[in-house]
Each structure stands twice: as structure tokens, then as C-alpha cells.
């Protein structure tokens, strides 16, 4: 049965602004995470083997990858603090990325078993980072875990470093998990084990955060994450975190996968949470193909944020998928060329033409939807489909602008784009 009142009510179609979950603002160098600040994009460097006999040269190679990620748009870059060699390399890494115009505080040190020892042995090096990450599940075990956790938190307090308390279901505190599992099994109406696992993740993160506060770390120095591999688990865990606390939240799957699977899993989980106002910083943990740059994980995060209107990074190109009416590859070739043109020119445009990242461009392949779709964009072009005249209509801000034809359609359309940018974004 149709609800005509609902269908006819204009409010049904009103696009409301995403209401962000209220969280504490955490400052990581010059980057602000949480509150009403833009959702921050971060990544993790794959890293290189640090040669103990040639620390400076190794650091230069490490910094090259970090710089590539930062230049793509990663606002924070995580590095693994997994050896003395890495700790010794930090000043040289910072020096190299400073040369490229990036602040050393974009670096986040991710420590595991070795973190307690490294902050004691290399305090002046690690304080050069913007943030450190602690995994409560493997910083230590038994009483030693509490001692090591306390020492790292005290170090962070001393050097005014924010901390991400990052729980991972692959390295969850086994004592807490076993305790909750035992309690559950003793109940007459026991719950499925996956429910208890999610509960343990949230409890581990929040208990550790409260413990850090008890030691003296302010809540505006704490970021929380609970990493899992399944989208539905991610959603349930972060909804529970948002209901239970106001800590800034770092979103991401612990391992999303390779190729389309990794991108889809990341987009599915993060988009749902972000659309519901949950999440202050994000990462796409993608498995890159051999030889593929890790910058793709930065681009995926940017695309997710732009797709739901939370942030804008580049002009949006909407393009036709093709069908039986598209008789050639011209629309595909033009789409690729337009994307390449934007990628080449966007660094200059962003400096000279503020707001250009909000621009929309449509490249369509035939007359059926071409003109209509083009009119919804700032600039649109409708290429000829099967049986149509070999001409391409260009639309500007919803109105017919001109017709292009011949062998120079691509160059002429790119010139139109460039002129539009200069005219409308100053």
C-alpha cells in the first residue's frame, strides 16, 4: 500500500546535513581530529628495511614513500615502530620530509611489543612524531602489560603526545576475552561468541582509555580504534563506541583485501558509519598488488568522503558506463583524458582557484541521457551515440553552450574546462 502523504511531503526529499557524533578534539601537530573538524585522511607506509650500518640512507628511502603518500593527500602517515633501527632513523626521516615541505608531526608511530623499550631508549627521537599508537593486546602480558602501558602513557604525557589506543581483533587481550567468554558460557541464555568478541573489543578500548586518563592523559589526547575485518562487525563495534564515549574515533578495517574487494569492503563499512556521523579520521587498509603504489588507499578515502559530501578534494567527473547505443570508445577515451587533465592541473588550480574541488563535469556517450545528465553538472558534454550525428553538445551550468565536432573535441573540451575554472573560481 502506497503512503501518498509521505510521497507528496516535500520534507521526504530534503537532504539534511550529516550530524556528527560529538567527540573531543585531538591535535596531532597542525592536524585537528574530532569535534566538527573535517574527517582526516591517513595512511600507513609500507616501510623499508633500515640498515643498521647506513641509517641515514635507509631513512631517505623511507621518507620518499611517506612524502608520496603526503603529496597524494594523506594528512597523517603511520610508520611501524618495530626496531631500534627505525627509532634511530626518525630524525633523518623527519629531516627529509621537512625538505619536501611536510611537517614531521604528520608521522604516527605504531608500536607493538617493542614500544615500551623504544620510548625509554630513544625518547628524543620518538617525541619528534605527531602521535603514537598503542595496542593494549600486545604491549605486554599480565602485570608487565600494565607496567608497560603505564610507562608509555607517562611518556606521552611528558612529551605532550596524543595516543591512539588501537584494539585489533587479531591481537585482542586474551585475558579479557576469556573472562567474558567464561561469564557468557555460565549463563542459561548465553550469547553467540561473535557477540562476546565485539563486546570484548569495545571494553578493551574503553577500559584502556579510562586507564590512560587515570594515569593523567587528558581525554583530548586520546583517539580510539577497534579494527576488525568484516563490515558488519565494524559497524556494530563503532556504533557501540559512539554510544558509550566521546573519544575521537579512527575508522578502518584491519585488512580490507586486494583490488575491488578491498575498496568495496572499505567503502561499505566507512560510508555507513560516516553517513551516521561516526568517525573522525579514516584509513583504507588495502592490499596493494605487487608494484602498485600505496597512494591508492589515500585516494579511496578521499573518494569516500567526497561521495557523501563530507569533504571535497578534486572536481567530480561523472561518466557514462556505455550501452548498445554507444557505438565507439570515444566517451571512454574522453573520460580518461579529462581525469588525467584534472590530475595534472589540480595542484595549480587549488593554489590559484579556491573552490575548484567542488566543480562537477559530466562525460556522456549518447543523446538518451547525455543532455539531461550534462545539465546537472557545471560542465557537461554529450558525445554522439549509435546512429547520431558526429557532433558533441557542450552544456555549461545547465544551459546549452556550444557544439564540438571533428578531431579536436578532447582538446577543445579541456580548454573549456580550463576557462571555466579561471572564470568561476578566483
Curated annotation (Swiss-Prot):
Q: Where is the signal peptide?
A: none
List, in alphabetical order, the GO biological process terms annotated in this UniProt record: isopentenyl diphosphate biosynthetic process, methylerythritol 4-phosphate pathway; terpenoid biosynthetic process
According to UniProt, the reaction catalysed is: (2E)-4-hydroxy-3-methylbut-2-enyl diphosphate + oxidized [flavodoxin] + H2O + 2 H(+) = 2-C-methyl-D-erythritol 2,4-cyclic diphosphate + reduced [flavodoxin]
- Which cofactors does this protein require? [4Fe-4S] cluster
Keywords, A to Z, come to: 4Fe-4S, Iron, Iron-sulfur, Isoprene biosynthesis, Metal-binding, Oxidoreductase
**How cofactor binds (record note)?**
Binds 1 [4Fe-4S] cluster.
- Under the GO molecular function aspect, what terms does this record hold? 4 iron, 4 sulfur cluster binding; 4-hydroxy-3-methylbut-2-en-1-yl diphosphate synthase activity (ferredoxin); 4-hydroxy-3-methylbut-2-enyl-diphosphate synthase activity (flavodoxin); iron ion binding
Which pathway is this protein engaged in?
A: Isoprenoid biosynthesis; isopentenyl diphosphate biosynthesis via DXP pathway; isopentenyl diphosphate from 1-deoxy-D-xylulose 5-phosphate: step 5/6
Q: Which Pfam families match?
A: GcpE
Q: Which PANTHER family match?
A: 4-HYDROXY-3-METHYLBUT-2-EN-1-YL DIPHOSPHATE SYNTHASE, 4-HYDROXY-3-METHYLBUT-2-EN-1-YL DIPHOSPHATE SYNTHASE (FERREDOXIN), CHLOROPLASTIC
Task: Give the similarity note.
Answer: Belongs to the IspG family.
**Protein name as annotated:** 4-hydroxy-3-methylbut-2-en-1-yl diphosphate synthase (flavodoxin)
Which gene codes for it?
ispG
Amino acid at each position: 500500500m502506497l503512503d501518498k502523504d509521505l510521497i507528496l511531503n516535500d520534507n521526504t526529499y530534503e537532504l539534511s546535513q550529516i550530524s556528527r557524533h560529538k567527540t573531543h578534539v585531538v591535535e596531532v601537530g597542525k592536524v585537528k581530529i574530532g569535534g566538527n573538524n573535517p574527517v582526516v585522511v591517513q595512511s600507513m607506509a609500507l616501510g623499508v628495511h633500515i640498515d643498521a650500518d647506513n641509517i641515514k640512507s635507509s631513512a631517505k628511502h623511507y621518507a620518499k614513500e611517506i612524502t608520496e603518500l603526503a603529496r597524494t593527500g594523506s594528512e597523517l602517515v603511520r610508520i611501524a615502530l618495530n626496531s631500534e633501527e627505525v627509532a634511530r632513523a626518525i630524525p633523518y626521516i623527519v629531516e627529509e620530509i621537512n625538505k619536501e615541505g611536510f611537517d614531521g608531526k604528520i608521522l604516527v608511530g605504531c608500536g607493538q611489543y617493542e614500544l615500551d623499550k623504544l620510548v625509554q631508549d630513544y625518547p628524543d627521537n620518538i617525541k619528534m612524531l605527531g602521535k603514537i599508537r598503542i595496542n593494549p593486546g600486545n604491549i605486554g602480558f599480565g602485570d608487565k602489560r600494565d607496567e608497560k602501558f603505564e610507562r608509555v602513557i607517562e611518556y606521552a604525557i611528558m612529551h605532550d603526545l596524543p595516543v591512539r589506543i588501537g584494539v585489533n581483533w587479531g591481537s585482542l587481550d586474551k585475558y579479557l576475552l576469556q573472562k567474558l567468554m567464561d561469564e557468557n558460557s555460565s549463563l542459561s541464555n548465553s550469547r553467540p561468541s561473535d557477540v562476546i568478541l565485539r563486546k570484548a573489543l569495545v571494553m578493551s578500548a574503553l577500559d584502556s582509555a579510562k586507564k590512560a586518563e587515570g594515569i593523567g592523559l587528558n581525554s583530548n589526547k586520546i583517539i580510539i580504534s577497534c579494527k576488525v575485518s568484516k563490515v558488519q562487525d565494524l559497524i556494530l563495534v563503532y556504533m557501540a563506541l559512539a554510544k558509550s564515549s566521546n573519544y575521537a574515533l579512527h575508522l578502518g578495517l584491519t585488512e580490507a583485501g586486494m583490488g575491488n574487494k578491498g575498496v568495496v569492503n572499505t567503502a561499505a563499512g566507512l560510508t555507513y558509519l560516516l553517513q551516521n556521523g561516526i568517525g573522525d579520521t579514516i584509513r583504507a587498509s588495502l592490499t596493494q598488488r605487487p608494484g602498485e603504489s600505496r597512494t591508492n588507499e589515500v585516494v579511496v578515502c578521499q573518494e569516500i568522503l567526497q561521495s557523501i559530501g563530507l569533504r571535497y578534494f578534486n572536481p567530480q567527473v561523472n561518466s557514462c558506463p556505455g550501452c548498445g547505443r554507444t557505438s565507439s570508445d570515444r566517451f571512454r577515451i574522453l573520460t580518461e583524458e579529462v581525469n588525467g587533465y584534472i590530475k595534472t592541473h589540480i595542484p595549480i588550480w587549488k593554489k590559484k582557484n579556491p573552490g575548484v574541488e567542488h566543480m562537477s563535469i559530466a562525460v556522456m556517450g549518447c543523446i538518451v541521457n547525455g543532455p539531461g545528465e550534462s545539465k546537472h553538472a557545471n560542465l557537461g558534454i554529450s558525445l554522439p551515440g549509435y546512429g547520431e550525428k558526429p557532433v558533441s553538445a557542450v552544456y555549461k551550468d545547465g544551459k546549452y553552450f556550444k557544439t564540438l565536432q571533428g578531431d579536436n573535441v578532447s582538446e577543445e573540451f579541456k580548454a573549456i574546462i580550463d576557462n571555466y575554472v579561471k572564470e568561476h573560481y578566483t
